[in-house]
Curated annotation (Swiss-Prot):
Residues 1-41, 96-169 are annotated as: Disordered. One of its GO terms (molecular function) is DNA-binding transcription factor activity, RNA polymerase II-specific. Expressed in the ear placode and vesicle and in cells forming the vestibulo-acoustic ganglion. It comes from Oryzias latipes (Japanese rice fish). The keyword Transport does not apply. SUPFAM superfamilies: Homeodomain-like. One of its GO terms (biological process) is regulation of transcription by RNA polymerase II. Residues 125-137 have a biased composition (Acidic residues). This is Homeobox protein HMX3-B.
């Protein structure tokens, strides 16, 4: 009786974390998976590891040589290998540092993306198709805009180049200067440097102006000579041209029978000829007087 009373008065034993009840409670309350479970932030915010805080899990020692990350990242993220340290009751300063570094590009690069539902994938594909159609419609507009810009740039460059061209100044000579230059040119076609300098000083011109005038005058003289030679050649060719006039004549053949008695043949012989000359005797009166 004493043993039975002691058993009845004994307080109920505290449920251990490994009891079936606790394990079933985890399965009875399934949590909806969030989109951020694949990222490190979703893992820390979810209550999965918080429920495992009371569990004593062994520490995993991973060599730094077999992992692609350097040893310094493994040392900083040591709290990753202690799941029980992520619980609500055993949150330490190391876990807080991990939460601060969870948004680093190195950790996000190695975490897988969360699975997307069919509806979300369809919406994204529809958005991509709309974006592609808009981009295709904008491409010809961009091309036309680029062509217009190119044409404008070309016009601007042409307008910029036009004022840069310098107009050649033409020297106007007086009548006395032209007369003196012409008379000198008739005497001598080419001038020496000393003669050109003396002529320029006498006419109050520069040597370059005199030199250019003589060059232009020689070109004009050569053109005049070429035109005169061409005209002389044409007149000589016209004089040597032979004009042939057709001459009408008849071939020497048989006399034509259609000719009259008074006509002559082409050979000069009469068409009707008699072999003997006709002699007439004295006239005999046909009627005798009675």
């Amino acid at each position: 009786m004493a043993d039975s009373d002691a058993q009845e008065t004994r307080p109920p034993a505290k449920d251990s974390p490994f009891s079936i009840k606790n394990l079933l409670n985890i399965e009875d309350k399934p949590t909806k998976p969030k989109n951020g479970l694949g990222s490190s932030k979703g893992v820390f915010e979810s209550g999965f590891f918080s429920r495992l805080g009371d569990l004593s899990l062994p520490r995993f020692e991973l060599p730094a040589q077999r992992i692609g990350l350097p040893a310094q990242y493994l040392e900083r993220a040591s709290a990753w290998w202690y799941p029980y340290a992520l619980g609500t009751h055993f949150r330490t300063a190391g876990a807080e540092k991990v939460n601060q570094r969870e948004t680093s590009p190195i950790l996000d690069r190695h975490t897988p993306d969360p699975p997307k539902s069919d509806q979300e994938s369809k919406e994204e594909s529809a958005d991509d198709e709309i974006a592609l159609e808009e981009s295709d419609a904008e491409e010809p507009k961009k091309e036309t805009d680029q062509e217009d810009d190119w044409m404008r740039k070309g016009e601007d460059l042409e307008s910029d180049k036009k004022p840069c061209r310098k107009k050649k100044t033409r020297t106007v000579f007086s009548r006395s200067q032209v007369f003196q230059l012409e008379s000198t040119f008739d005497i001598k076609r080419y001038l020496s440097s000393s003669e050109r300098a003396g002529l320029a000083a006498s006419l109050h011109l520069t040597e370059t102006q005199v030199k250019i005038w003589f060059q232009n005058r020689r070109n004009k003289w050569k053109r005049q000579l070429a035109a005169e030679l061409e005209a002389a050649n044409m007149s000589h060719a016209a004089a040597q041209r032979i004009v042939r006039v057709p001459i009408l004549y008849h071939d020497s053949g048989a006399p034509e029978a259609t000719g009259g008695p008074g006509t002559n043949s082409p050979g000069g012989q009469p068409l009707l000829s008699f072999p003997h000359h006709m002699y007439y005797s004295n006239a005999v009166p046909l009627l005798r007087p009675v």
